[in-house]
């Protein structure tokens, strides 16, 4: 006989009893009605009190059912018990000792008991956080309907966290793309949402050179003090990120900084940790940083004796990092809680290997950015980097799961870097994995969808989120699943109008529509570009000026004859809806986002995905030339990517146009992209550069370019475009240039020695050049490579 699965139904007084049939079993339900949350006032921790309030309020929001919190056992109705294991709670029955409750902090177990006519669920924590997180588990696994809550029958279960630190930085500052416009109530709600999935640490930014935002509803000092109180209420660790954005040799500024820090310590009801970044921002050597940390630690201990001081090595040179390592090994400072790894810092492997065991290692993962960041999207199609950019809505459950597992063996926990709600899914993924590294990603997303959307869309929405990540994999033009993803989200949108004002729902819809619109535009504007190139080749017969005029008319169709206009309108409407629902600022002009790189996807909605802007500028240069030279210039543009038989063109770094470029290991094998160097994506002119698009995607140096089945009797030339220097090798042999331009469009040419051609295969590699002394924007790079067979 098959095992029967039950459905528990928790109903309010107006609830309707439903029955469910599972497998071949007769219809059976276990019904909990008129639910009371039982919690005796016996040495209650703040987390326990918050758990009861959270359970009652969140169930009420989703169902309308009212679950009172009582200190006395109800005479009737069903009961959810919240208790610490150590509390002498008076229950009218005995509870099982199995499963065993772990002694590890934050652990909990959940039991089901039948008491007379009452169905009872017991959430027992080893401490008040255990009660809180056990309650969170119940909330995210219950199935919600009007006036009732269904729950798959829970076996007796127990759970403990893998990592002791699971947190997120929520800096109340103008740089943020959403929560700088929140009220205190909205801020607390978001913290509570994170708590439901296991977050136990929140980090604020109380000292930063950014005191004003056009969106602030609360003064920064007041909001940061409030966040500390929220952490106290939910028994969470409260951290502060406190960079020093000045020269530490300046005694006056140093004293002012320490004075500000002391005032913050006085105002904060709770502080558990302080994070001082070595750099990003800040530019001080460790010889000056360490004495400052000692002073900070002394002030911190004065007001919060159990708090600890931490430092990252971000921005330090290798020698400076070694200085810090040696200092710790020699001095073993008691004020130091541990080190922090993150963007622009030594690897977790290096730091863990040299850090004495008594010190913890926290990671500071960038969950918020997609490009020009710590964890870039592998080989992102340039059409997305040009439009969605660095800080778009970015659910990446599979990739961030792989990243977590790569770092997991080395870290004691994490508090992430985030600058808005757009990375909400990534926060939940890392939090859930830090509780249970074996957690299934789809199951996490099902709980996410169930809790934040509706139980009726749990499966479909979870799969829809997974599909959004797939939208960003591979060339945009050949990724037909982008259209399928939009179809799925359209169906969900139509079937669930009650979710229209749900900001998490709106974010997923925006991405689905935006991705599809971008793909449609790319296909359309590429066709327009082809028509323009054909027109250029007619210049000799119709005249160069006429060809350019007609080309302008063709290019203008991107605006005068738009494609997918209904989708475009809906994208604009969703951006407006998100601003109203969660203050997401998708435009600098319209919504006063802090910058074009800060989630301003609406400002790039119609950014050309062909070379329209570059061509407009080229036409101005060409106009002054003699007719013969005009025609020649237009022919060069028309044939830019067009090569003859046996010749090849690659746009280096463009996943859809670099067939000869060798890539490294797949991100599933190399999630941090240490062996698969990722392309660079130029953001000059605030992302509105008018350069040729092929010059905006680049590799510092490609791993290699490979060409097989070479005609051994022919002569070949390698042409390279890019910026700066180029130390080219062919089949391992350094080759000399016959032409050596250093700017964009100023081609370098390297004749291929005939002895190498006769090998039948050509492999191009580049010797690295040390340019660390240059800003990355000025460092050498490769954007295009041609292998030209002389005809």
Language-model-derived ranges and their functions:
Residues 694-713, 721-790:
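Beta-strand-rich ligand-recognition modules
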Residues 629-713, 772-791:
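Glycan-recognition and processing domains
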Residues 38-45, 82-87, 124-126, 172, ...:
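Structural motif
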Residues 51-54, 58-60, 100-252, 266-270, ...:
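Feature activates predominantly on carbohydrate-active enzymes
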Residues 3, 7-10, 15-116, 151:
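Acidic, contiguous N-terminal accessory segments
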Residues 418-426, 438-644:
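C-terminal non-catalytic alpha-helical accessory regions
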Residues 67-68, 145-147, 200, 212-228, ...:
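Catalytic-core regions of glycoside hydrolase
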Residues 45-47, 89-92, 131-132, 175-179, ...:
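Short, solvent-exposed loop/turn elements at domain surfaces
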């Amino acid at each position: 006989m098959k095992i029967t699965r039950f459905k528990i139904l928790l109903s309010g007084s107006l609830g309707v009893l439903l029955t469910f049939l599972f497998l071949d079993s007769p219809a059976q339900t276990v019904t909990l009605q008129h639910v009371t949350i039982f919690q005796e006032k016996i040495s209650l921790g703040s987390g326990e009190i918050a758990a009861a309030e959270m359970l009652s309020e969140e169930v009420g929001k989703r169902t309308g059912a009212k679950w009172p919190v009582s200190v006395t056992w109800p005479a009737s109705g069903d009961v959810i018990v919240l208790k610490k294991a150590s509390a002498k709670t008076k229950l009218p029955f005995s509870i099982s000792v199995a499963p065993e409750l772990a002694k590890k902090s934050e652990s909990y177990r959940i039991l089901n008991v039948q008491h007379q006519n009452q169905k009872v669920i017991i959430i027992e924590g080893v401490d008040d956080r255990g009660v809180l997180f056990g309650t969170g588990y119940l909330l995210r696994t219950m199935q919600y309907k009007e006036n009732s809550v269904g729950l798959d029958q829970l076996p007796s279960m127990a759970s403990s966290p893998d990592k002791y630190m699971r947190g997120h930085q929520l800096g109340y500052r103008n740089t943020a793309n959403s929560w700088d416009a929140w009220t205190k109530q909205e801020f607390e709600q978001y913290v509570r949402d994170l708590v439901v999935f296991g977050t136990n640490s929140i980090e604020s930014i109380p000292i930063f050179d950014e005191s004003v935002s056009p969106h602030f509803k609360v003064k920064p000092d007041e909001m940061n003090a409030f966040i500390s109180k929220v952490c106290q209420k939910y028994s969470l660790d409260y951290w502060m990120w406190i960079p020093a954005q000045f020269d530490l040799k300046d005694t006056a500024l140093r004293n002012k900084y320490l004075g500000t820090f002391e005032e913050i310590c006085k105002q904060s009801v709770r502080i558990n940790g302080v994070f001082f970044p070595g750099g990003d921002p800040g530019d001080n050597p460790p010889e000056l940083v360490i004495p400052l940390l000692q002073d900070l630690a002394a002030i911190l201990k004065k007001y919060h004796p159990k708090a600890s001081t931490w430092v990252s090595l971000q921005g330090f040179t290798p020698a400076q990092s070694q200085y810090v390592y040696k200092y710790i090994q020699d001095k073993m400072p008691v004020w130091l809680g541990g080190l922090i790894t993150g963007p622009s810092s030594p690897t977790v492997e290096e730091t863990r290997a040299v850090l004495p065991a008594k010190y913890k290692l926290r990671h500071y993962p960038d969950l918020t950015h997609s490009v020009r960041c710590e964890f870039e999207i592998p080989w992102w199609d340039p059409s997305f980097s040009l439009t969605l950019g660095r800080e778009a809505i970015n659910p990446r459950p599979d990739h961030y799961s792989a990243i977590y597992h790569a770092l997991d063996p080395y870290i004691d926990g994490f508090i992430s870097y985030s600058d808005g709600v757009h990375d909400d899914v990534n926060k939940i993924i890392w939090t859930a994995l830090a509780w249970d590294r074996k957690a299934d990603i789809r199951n996490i997303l099902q709980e996410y969808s169930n809790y934040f959307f509706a139980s009726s869309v749990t499966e479909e929405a979870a799969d829809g989120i997974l599909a959004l990540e797939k939208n960003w994999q591979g060339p945009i033009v050949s990724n037909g699943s982008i259209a399928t993803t939009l179809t799925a989200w359209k169906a969900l949108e139509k079937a669930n109008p009650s979710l229209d004002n749900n900001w998490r729902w709106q974010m997923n819809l925006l991405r689905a529509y935006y991705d599809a619109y971008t793909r449609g535009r790319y296909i359309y504007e590429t066709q327009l570009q082809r028509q323009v190139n054909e027109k250029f080749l007619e210049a000799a017969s119709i005249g160069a000026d006429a060809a350019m005029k007609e080309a302008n008319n063709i290019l203008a169709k991107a605006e005068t004859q738009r494609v997918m206009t209904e989708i475009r309108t809906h994208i604009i409407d969703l951006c407006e809806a998100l601003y109203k629902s969660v203050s997401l600022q998708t435009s600098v002009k319209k919504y006063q986002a802090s910058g074009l790189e800060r989630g301003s996807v609406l400002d790039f909605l119609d950014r050309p995905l062909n070379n329209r802007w570059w061509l407009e500028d080229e036409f101005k240069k060409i106009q002054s030339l003699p007719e013969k030279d005009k025609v020649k210039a237009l022919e060069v543009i028309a044939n830019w990517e067009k090569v003859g038989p046996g010749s090849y063109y690659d746009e280096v770094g463009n996943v859809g146009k670099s067939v000869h470029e060798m890539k490294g290991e797949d991100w599933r094998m190399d999630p941090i992209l240490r062996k698969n160097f990722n392309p660079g994506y130029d953001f000059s002119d605030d992302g509105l550069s008018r350069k040729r698009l092929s010059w905006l995607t680049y590799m510092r140096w490609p791993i290699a370019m490979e060409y097989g089945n070479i005609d051994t009797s022919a002569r070949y030339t390698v042409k390279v475009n890019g910026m700066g220097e180029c130390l080219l090798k062919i089949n391992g042999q350094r080759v000399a240039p016959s032409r050596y331009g250093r700017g964009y469009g100023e081609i370098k040419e390297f004749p291929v020695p005939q002895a190498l051609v006769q090998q039948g295969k050509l492999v191009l590699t580049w010797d690295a050049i040390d340019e660390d002394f240059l800003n990355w924007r000025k460092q050498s790079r490769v954007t295009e490579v041609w292998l030209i067979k002389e005809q």
